[in-house]
Amino acid sequence: MYEGKHIHFSEVDNKPLCSYSPKLCKQRRLNGYAFCIRHVLEDKTAPFKQCEYVAKYNSQRCTNPIPKSEDRRYCNSHLQVLGFIPKKERKKKTDPVDEVKARHQMDAMAFSLTVPTLALKMPNGLDSMSLSPPGARVPLHYLDTELEDPFAFNEEDDDLKKGVTVRKKLQSKLAQNRQRQRETEILKVRQEHFSTPPTPPQQHTHLSPLSTSLKPPAPPQGSVCKSPQPQNTSLPMQGVAPTTHSIAQIRQASHKRPLPLLPSSRAPISDAPRTDRILMKAAAFSPHLSCISRLQRLVKLCTQKRQLDADLFPHLGLDWSEESGEELEDADQASPYQVAWSIRETLRHERHTSDDDDMESRSSRVTQLCTYFQQKYKHLCRLERAESRQKKCRHTFRKALLQAASKEPECTGQLIQELRRAACSRASLRQTKLKEVEPAACSGTVKGEQCTKQALPFTRHCFQHILLNRSQQLFSSCTAKFADGQQCSVPVFDITHQTPLCEEHAKKMDNFLRGDNSRKVQHQQQRKPRKKTKPPALTKKHKKKRRRGPRRPQKPIPPAVPQGNLSMPTSVSLPVEASQMRSPSTPELSADELPDDIANEITDIPHDLELNQEDFADVLPRLPDDLQDFDFFEGKNGDLLPTTEEAEELERALQAVTSLECLSTIGVLSQSDGVPVQGLSDRGMGVFSTGTDASGIQSLSREVNTDLGELLNGRIVHDSFSSLELDENLLHSAPLSSPPTALAGQIQGQFSAPASAGLTSATLLSQSALGERAFPGQFHGLHDGSHASQRPHPAQLLSKADDLITSRQQYSSDHSHSSPHGSHYDSEHVPSPYSDHITSPHTSYSGDNMAATFSAEMPIMAQHLLPTQLEVPLGGVVNPRTHWGNLPVNLGDPSAFSNLLGADGHLLSTSLSTPPTTSNSETTQPAFATVTPSSSSVLPGLPQTSFSGMGPSAELMASTSPKQQLPQFSAAFGHQLSSHSGIPKDLQPSHSSIAPPTGFTATGATATSTNNASPPFPSPN
């Protein structure tokens, strides 16, 4: 079984519901299918087909299913729309009591129908029937039970099978309605009119219960104040008193006796033996009140009947539709039988005529004719009964009026006057609704005098003064104004426009609009011949411009650079201006090649023309449709503000510039400080100072920081940087191969005991952009033999090296936790470089060994050197648990820092791409690789002193890569350094460095904060 997409079950009995795919349907499924009857067409295997009706308004086909077994093309709804079957009638509410009576008490009426002999011989299923006598009666309940016409034609014809079901329903409904209506009309009236109880022959004794027994019951629908049968007024008024006691009995028996329905010619004969019904004389009703009460009761019944026939709620605005109105008119003229069958026969006749079906059998036509005559006969019988009821009602009312007038004329006269007064009031109400109100004079005043004009209907003002009536909502004042600004006050009756205009201003507006259109047409006509006179080349060049509409004189475009007064002076030569504004699409045209008519036209353009609304009328419709999606003031992403990536990039660049400016003030701040311990501690550059000649160390720090500030502030121009790679002559082999032992001895003499410190590779690598270029003349004589007097302070070199190490390591240690790998900037966690907050990180050194190593009065080392960067092993042995990226360096050997300065006074930088130096010992390379794996760069300036206990014969600067990559500081500030120091953009170094060790990222070098700095080494207690 095929199922749709929506598989769901009922919440009541958990049975599967319709699985219609497009939307959720909660109808029950058909047996054997997964869809309801409305959506069963989704299952292609179902024995249903789709209705072929196509709607005119949307050209969509009807989706109602039709069983394939039925030979029809349309569903039931569209069969009614197309007129093939009659439309459904409106159901009328009936009294349930009447339904019970109509169901159990069948009508005695029967109709006689003589069947033609020709119809009996035709093959219509009636061959076995015999001729019915003229008086044969077919009971009406036959239609209620069988619901089929006994004289119906054969249903073998396919075209006639379509309306079988509808015809059966129609016949059953019509028969039931007619039966109910006839029963209620006949039975109720017989019970209410002049039915006296059986009494003795005395006249005065049988009238007292009459007044009590004749209480008017609630009139049901269809009850009329009519007598049971017509009275023969031509018969004499015989006062047969002994027969009055049998009146009630006869009438009660008449309820059970069938009433023969005969043609109108036989009706008087049927009423002949019932002459005793009119034996009630006025003398028989001596109490006067009984006559008046009977008359009042009859009047009340007639009024109720009239109210039942009238509209129930006319004041609510409820009215019949056009279709229902037509149906009511047809029902007044003919019975539902005649209406239904006449429409059916007409449709059949039209269909047969259009199809030109000559093969229709004679039997079907005869059967059809018999059916029509049957319905026609029933209709005539119904009309005859209705007419007889009307006559009985009028006769009864006249008799009651005569009796009341003879016995109690005064009361009868009052009753008649009341009836006339009520009738006159109803008629006057109708007349007041229809007739017009008499015109009255206007109540307005003109210059203090009463207006003599006639007032408008239903008002007290004329048309001129109608605006004085504040309650009216039909008229409004003209919304136009005169030339002097005065508002027009003419009343206007205009309910279609939001801005009503009087007749005068409406004409002016029409003329203006008509003139505007004529001007447009004239303008277009003037433009057409000018197009034809254009040269072919020029027309071809400016083909796209001509599509934009008529040429309007406009002001010349002002020059790009303001010339003081932004308004265009009139003395400017317009032809020259036009030649300057010529489009680059026509570079071959010069001012001399322009046609004369164009030059003359340009010179004739006035300079004070303003753009009007009509100037854009022809231009805006010619603009392309896709121009509305283009915004001249938006970016390519469609927003006015920069994107998130652009904003973050801009913020990082500004923070980087701020960091550079902070670094550039190092030299100035260091010169103002006189204490060597606090000289550069706030900037993250500590100084190893001893008790010997602190002023020399301070002067060296000032010189270095001054040149560093000049480098960062761009005072050193890019002309002095010929390449980002250091020349080989800057790396002399003498200091690299033979470190001075004198400096080592002095350093060992300065410190009381040898100390081994673990400098991380990131710390040694941090000697980056601070010394990115050689500083000319600052350290020129430090390694020169002729200036040996300037070299007795190796602590200065150590201080300078640690200054650089500490400042760069501070960037690494402070921001390695806040910046993700792979990003150059961190816009969220950039602390202030002026922060002096100091935390206490974990320490891994021994206090006893430090007490033996440094004296109590030794100045504080770099505050920003973390304890993980300085490892002091016990007993001079290197800590076997080396941290990632830590490189143990012996602080007692100054040769580890002596070669940071070249032979000719240049500070060597490990941040630039330097060529690999030759190693004296190949055995030291694996050891270095194990200590600093994945380091960002190698250290070309370090000597072959003891690294992790290795001998001084090894040179650890060898590298397997041909070029050393930029470290983190240079990678982060490459753009800012190039913009400040003038490094060309094409010479900026690459950022594709080797992955740094854990804890140090490229972003960590971008910040300049001193947060999380390590405390200084404690003094021994």
Swiss-Prot record:
Its main location: nucleus. Residues 911-926, 995-1014 have a biased composition (Low complexity). Putative regulatory component of the chromatin remodeling INO80 complex which is involved in transcriptional regulation, DNA replication and probably DNA repair. It comes from Mus musculus (Mouse). Keywords: DNA damage, DNA recombination, DNA repair, Isopeptide bond, Nucleus, Phosphoprotein, Transcription, Transcription regulation, Ubl conjugation. GO terms for biological process: chromatin remodeling; DNA recombination; DNA repair; positive regulation of DNA repair; positive regulation of DNA-templated transcription; positive regulation of telomere maintenance in response to DNA damage; regulation of cell cycle; regulation of chromosome organization. Component of the chromatin remodeling INO80 complex; specifically part of a complex module associated with the N-terminus of INO80. It is found in: Nucleus. The lineage of its organism: Eukaryota, Metazoa, Chordata, Craniata, Vertebrata. Pfam families: zf-C3Hc3H. Belongs to the INO80D family. The gene is Ino80d. One of its GO terms (cellular component) is Ino80 complex. InterPro entries: Potential_DNA-bd. Residues 224-239, 931-940 have a biased composition (Polar residues). Residues 520-554 have a biased composition (Basic residues). This is INO80 complex subunit D. There is a cross-link at residue 87 (Glycyl lysine isopeptide (Lys-Gly) (interchain with G-Cter in SUMO2)). The modification Phosphoserine is found at residue 132. Residues 194-239, 514-570, 808-844, 911-940, 976-1021 are annotated as: Disordered.
